Amino acid sequence: VDFSYPVETRRSAGSRGFTLIELMVVVVIIGLLAAIAMPQIASRMRERRTNQAAQQIALLYRNARLRAMGRGFAVLVNYNSTSGFRVLETLPAGGLMNCAPMLPPSCTNTNWAVPTQTRVVETFNPGVYTGVLVGVTSQPSGAAASNLDLCFTPRGRAFSRTLAADELAPMTGLIDIQVGQAVPMLQRHVNVLPNGMARVSP
């Protein structure tokens, strides 16, 4: 009896590939899983960018305060809704080589608009994080501001103003910097306290 034909048939049936319908079912399942997962992944990415921007802004203010206390000269952080953040430090009278000026530059006796009296030591534009929006509210007025100058003295005190034409005045209320995206429930707050300390809160 010749059994070669059935054996060959069984081998051929066992080694066959996927049918077109089976491949289409697999593709549909993968597409459904991707559709379910993508919104969650996108939300996580937005949250991560928001957190990173908020932490970097808070660190910028902390470093500015420490720089003022360490150098013995005033340091100002300027926020502008268009250009972002700039950190400026005062220069000693006579330039960088003068280590002992008669009157150390401070928040109030420095003309921050004159390049010869200041220099930019750091910049940060939140726009590098896709979709991140920044807003500033000063207390106790609660008014939104498109510009904010916050100056730290060598003793760590903080002076602020929201208009460049105004005089810098001692901080008496909280400054709230909102960092978020155009998505509900996705926002972080950078709070700068009257003592100059900065912290991040939900």
Predicted feature locations:
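N-terminal helix-rich module
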Residues: 2-10, 21-24, 32, 36-62, ...
